[in-house]
Amino acid sequence: MKIKELTNEEFMVFQEHFPVSSPYQTSEYAMTMNKQEYDSFYLGMYDDNNILIAASLIMVELLGKFRYAYAPRGFLIDYNNENHVKEFTKLVKKDLRQKNIIAIKISPLIIKSIYTKKDGIITAPNFENIYNLLKDLDYYHLGYNNYFEAIKPRYEAIIDLNPNTSLMFSDISKNYRTKIRASDRIGIRIYKGDENYLPLLYKLTKKKYPRNLEYLKSLYNYYKNKNMIDLYFALLDTKRYLINIQKEYQEQNIKCAKVTDDIFKNQGKASNSLIAKKIIEDNKLEILKRQLIHATQLLQQSPDGIIVASAIMVKQQKEVYLILDGYDVNYKSVNAKHLLIWKLMEKYAKEGYEKFNLGGISNPLLENNKYKGLNN
């Protein structure tokens, strides 16, 4: 076996035909990170017949006076093939040593277990063998984490898409379905955007992701060249929103009037339950009144609508990845992100994609999980 540096084209061809890979193992991602002042190169192992067997995107970062390499999501290799893993590791170490790189860090796509509400925890049968193999090759395991301590998340939420979108919708939790319907009813509309919307996406995500606007621009433009990226946003239709609030206010007004009428009809013998009901209905009316005033102001200030959520998706093989998403916290109550995610699931399911990767989450089985709300 031999190792060599691959050209961008050689790596791209190998990666595109490799059975399982991540957007972070692509030349597009490498070029994006180059714009963030990281160096990168590709290594490939081939046999005597010049057939490429394994490859890796290597990014180099300064660590004081030293340099170390990082392979995001690990090598493009069959980790079940012990001989290939051993040989590739040996050759990579030798190559990096010649480049005065002191270490390599990987976050490989090796599944330890799968958790579903239906089946519970399903342990991957080959994980322990792969784990022990890597340890024997002097890879140092940094330990299991429950939250977001690693460069790439330990846990990912992945949804199996179903072209029967009605059935897929029925599998969503009742609470989530209610929010989706409510968001659609009050006037949230989903639209496809382009690079002109990147500054807005950055504004919505800058507190959540440690990336700058130039990163978003590079990411979008490199993946766009191969039609691998989509940007969508949720717009609050302020006119429709006002109409909906007006309707709810009128309906609530009728309810309040009816309760008041019931009390007058039963003067002197009005039950405590009727009085309590009136207080509850009046409070609801007061809330709607404030919402009505706010909705009127929104229409006056933003007659063309307000963008309240946005997301970037990368399409790779049969899977779609939610790379970045964000929403305006001032409009959290309209549940725009819920509708946006559902509409994207629906769209990609109809296009034949099989999985929807929502990205990193915290440990779903951890008690007293401080990030539990982010998993919902």
Q: How would you label these PLM feature ranges?
A:
Residues M1-K2:
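Extreme N-terminal starter segment of soluble prokaryotic enzymes
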Residues P153:
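Active-site neighborhood for divalent-cation/phosphate handling
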Residues F66-E149, K315-N376:
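Acyl-donor binding region in acyl/amide transferases
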Residues E5-N49, A54-K65, Y139-A150, D160-N164, ...:
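A conserved beta-strand-loop-helix scaffold within acyl/acetyltransferase catalytic domains
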